[in-house]
Every structure is written in structure tokens, then in C-alpha cells.
Amino acid sequence: MKTFLLVILLLFSVSLYSQKVTLLYVNSSWNKSNDYKHLSKLKNVRVLKVNYDDKPKKFKQQVKSVPAIILFDESNKLKRVWQGGLSMRLNVDPKEIQTMINKIIGQ
């Protein structure tokens, strides 16, 4: 799990100072029809969108299914992962994601 976090940090070289929570959204170009449409509804979170196809093998070994949503706190600690199932759809209520974001930031 530490390797996964390190790979993500190195891949994106993102400064995470403006938000306490970062959401990494991973999907593939061949799965655009199943894009998760609710990201814009989420508050108090920095959203990074990543194309699975463009990432190295090590990244792909860590993300087993797309689409996927991965939440990190301000210390870059992995907090929660949601992944698409056999349907290649992400069936998670945005309220569930927002609840986890609020929990991380202490609201």
C-alpha cells in the first residue's frame, strides 16, 4: 500500500496544500461511457482525473478496475477506495463519498 501511495505521488507531483482531501479519479478512454458524473457535486475536495491508459504498468497493477475513486487525506494517507465492478460502472452514491470527505476534514 505504501508503494501505491508513493507511485501516485511521484506520478502527479501535486501540491496538496489547498485542500485537506484529495480525490483521485481513474478511468480509461475505452470506458468513457461509464464516467462518474457526480464529481462536481463534491465539496471540500481537490479532484484529480487520471487516464488509466497513460499510466505505467506499476500503477495499473494497483488499480484493478475502472472507474475508481481513491481518497487521500492531507498527509497523503490512503483513506478509502471505490472501484467499478464487472459492469465497469462506479455505483456509489455521491453522498457516501461526501460523508467520507467530511469525516476526514472533521466536519
Positions of predicted regions on the chain:
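Solvent-exposed, acidic/flexible segments
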Residues: 32, 62, 90-94
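Sec-dependent N-terminal signal peptides
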Residues: 4-14
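Structural micro-motif
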Residues: 61-72
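Soluble periplasmic/extracytoplasmic beta-strand elements of cell-envelope proteins
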Residues: 22-25, 68-70, 81
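N-terminal post-signal-peptidase region of extra-cytosolic proteins
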Residues: 52-59
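Local sequence-structure signature of Cys/Sec-based thiol-disulfide redox active-site neighborhoods
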Residues: 18-47
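Non-catalytic, surface beta->alpha helical segment in thiol-disulfide oxidoreductase systems
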Residues: 73-107
